[in-house]
Amino acid sequence: MKKIIIPVAAIVLIGVVGPKFTGNGINEGLDNFVSILDKSPGYIATIESRETSWFSSSAVINVGIDPLMFAESGLNPAEMVPFEDLSATINVTAQHGPFLTLNGLNLGLSAWKAEVDPSVFRELLAYAEDEKFYSVTGNVGLFGGVNFEDIMPKFTVIPQDGGDEAITFSGWNGKGTASSESATYSGAIDLVTVSAEGVTFEMQSMILEGSVEGDWTAPMRGDFYNSASQFAIASINVDMPMLDTSAKLEELIIDVKTQKSEDDNLMDMAINYAIGSIQAPQFSGRDLVVKTEVNNLEKGFFKAYQEASAKPAQMEQSIADMIETKLLPQLQASPEINITEMSGKVADGNFSGKVMAKVSAIDSLPESLEDPAFWVSKAVIDSNLKLDKAMILWVGEQVVANQIQADPNAAGMTDEEIKAIAGEQVEGMIEMFTQQGMITVNADGEYEMTFTMQDGQAMLNGNPMPLPF
């Protein structure tokens, strides 16, 4: 599957960046497009050939994955062979306006399309003979706005080396707009199924939506940007009959928003997760929510980290250089990691909580970055967790059960016996923690834990908590 998935990332990137080359003039835009793609972490892009006439232009672009990404993957030479040429040829055609017929009759500055060769992945995938594995078409209006659509056909994976896997993909349909002020995109997959070695996997209705303000190639250059996106899956089902095990997840939603500062030097990022329900062996949950924020990301540090991540072979040296030259400006910006909400229902219980952690008032780095006293003196933490009675009983039972299972003397006990013993012990454990002040009971009958730290002083439920340094 790696031989398929990794090159697909390169091909689909055409749909993400492709509209860029239509805005300024075909040839200039094409050069900019390839330059942006080639500088994107992990990608290689070159113009193999191009032709330009009065009414049209065409080019052949080669897009691939940089093999240096796998230089320190730990794979032996034989396993590295599939990664040596992870590339695809993209045929780009553009028609000059104002009268356009390339993608249907229209008026505009230009019309364009980009398609992979008809032979792409034929040895690995089965899809209709009259279709390309990936294509994107678009028009540039008279005022410079871009509309485009991209398509990936329905396909099945051809089993390799006598395997019995069966993988189907219902196809991808996406559409978007782009201008000098913003860009939008949305796409969907109806169904993905996988069956291999007695395990079946089914994913239904995956939707991706997103928007970016300003120059929408900024994320690819490592610049900061304002954006909003959502990734949603209606359901995921996994069935493993040989283990008499199955799991189901419904209504997964991931929202991501970014907001840059007015001077473009800082960016806040919010990532929110929501799950309608999940059913798995020994676990069930409903209305699960985790809302997170990463605030005050500093531009130089963020960009250096992206560049280091794209070069695994030089990662160690890149990280060392980044710490030496970029870490202090990031820390001076007072970075924050916040969980503004975590809540839901697990088994028959409810929980809710929040965590805020940041560093502040850092003017210089300590002689040793491993000095815990320095970080404690600069850290600010504010956290709270609430569990109702059913929830704390469930958590306590899991803790006690894990302790019993780790005891060699319990090796012959059944899960039912372990659960029964855990149920007998958990009430006493909770009472002990309450008496010790590790947890409190609030006016609503909820079990609560509050931990704060500032100026090197830690507090647990309002009481000073000694630190080991």
Write out the residue ranges for each language-model feature.
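Positively charged n-region of N-terminal signal peptides that target proteins for export
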Residues: 1-4
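Glycine-rich, small/hydroxylated-residue low-complexity segments
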Residues: 6, 16, 20-469
